[in-house]
Amino acid sequence: MGILDKLYEENDSEIVEEFINQWDYIIDDIDLVIERLETDYKNSVDELFRIFHSLKSATAFLKLKRINVFAQLVEDVLENARQKDKATDELIDWLFLASGQIMKWYDEINHNKELSSIDARLLKLPKGY
């Protein structure tokens, strides 16, 4: 049984479909928001924080612990980023890695696979965040 089958088995189908639709929005926008960090830092950090906060809440409800813990980690980094005036290259690179991880899990859910492990490079947090 893949992860999508498990989600439908354990939750109302409307909730699962809403979760996938919400994730579609994240996938469509996240890289553009990361790119905007260089030109509109404060608004972009706030938007990224909202994205990962929403993902954290949804995955907690659906009991997707791996994604939930990861979303909390990114949210913590972004909370620290809110205290800064600009993004470092290291932060931007790390956020693109985080985006890639989210996209990989999105693909695995949509193809009803098991969730892969987190990319180990993401465990090295950007300095100062």
Regions found by a protein language model. Name each.
Residues M1-Y129:
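Non-catalytic helical tethers at domain boundaries
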